[in-house]
Amino acid sequence: MATTLTLSEAVTALQQGDVIAYPTEAVWGLGCDPRQETAVHTLLNIKQRASGKGLILVTAELNTLQDWLDLDTLSPERLHEVQASWPGPHTWVLPASTRAPHWITGHHNGLAVRISAHPLVSALCRAWNMALISTSANVAGQPPARRREDLDPSLLPHLAGIVDGPTGGLAQPTSIRDARSGHILRL
């Protein structure tokens, strides 16, 4: 069984380029430091996920991502719609700046971002003072874990540990919408 981490221990693990598991709004997630390309590739290898798909970033404050975003290209109405939905279970694909790492955007020109209202996710991001990768804690193509005890045992040896707590109780993973068009990409 993987080690249970305090928030402080989780921050240390993230700083060291490790991958952690933590509960999100609906399912358990895997996370790492989005600034460390090696950490992101480790996470993708654990999940057996293609790198071109792009990844979601979860944060407590949008300003942690200001260098990677080009919000000036959004209309005031679209930006207001995005900001009014946060914090909450809504992921938006925002226009990425040229500084956004390709290992996060994949083959896309946007950055998928959620400002979470989940107390543990928000506390982790605040303690970390940065966004973190948020992808479901499962091997690609397999169902995501809704409870800690449902985490795939094959993932556990590759994790620095688990930040324990309940999921937010949503029936489905968060919706994903394109902030530029308003189109729903995932319900």
From Swiss-Prot:
It is an enzyme of class 2 (transferase). GO terms for molecular function: ATP binding; double-stranded RNA binding; L-threonylcarbamoyladenylate synthase; tRNA binding. Its EC number is 2.7.7.87. The lineage of its organism: Bacteria, Pseudomonadati, Pseudomonadota, Gammaproteobacteria, Lysobacterales. PROSITE patterns: YRDC. Residues 4-187 form the YrdC-like domain. InterPro entries: DHBP_synth_RibB-like_a/b_dom, Sua5-like_dom, TC-AMP_synthase, TC-AMP_synthase_SUA5. The keyword Transcription does not apply. Keywords: ATP-binding, Cytoplasm, Nucleotide-binding, Nucleotidyltransferase, Transferase, tRNA processing. GO terms for cellular component: cytoplasm. Belongs to the SUA5 family. TsaC subfamily. It comes from Xylella fastidiosa (strain Temecula1 / ATCC 700964). HAMAP family: TsaC. It holds the Pfam family Sua5_yciO_yrdC. It catalyses: L-threonine + hydrogencarbonate + ATP = L-threonylcarbamoyladenylate + diphosphate + H2O. The keyword Cytoplasm applies. It is found in: Cytoplasm. Required for the formation of a threonylcarbamoyl group on adenosine at position 37 (t(6)A37) in tRNAs that read codons beginning with adenine. Catalyzes the conversion of L-threonine, HCO(3)(-)/CO(2) and ATP to give threonylcarbamoyl-AMP (TC-AMP) as the acyladenylate intermediate, with the release of diphosphate. Its main location: cytoplasm. One of its GO terms (biological process) is tRNA threonylcarbamoyladenosine modification. This is Threonylcarbamoyl-AMP synthase.
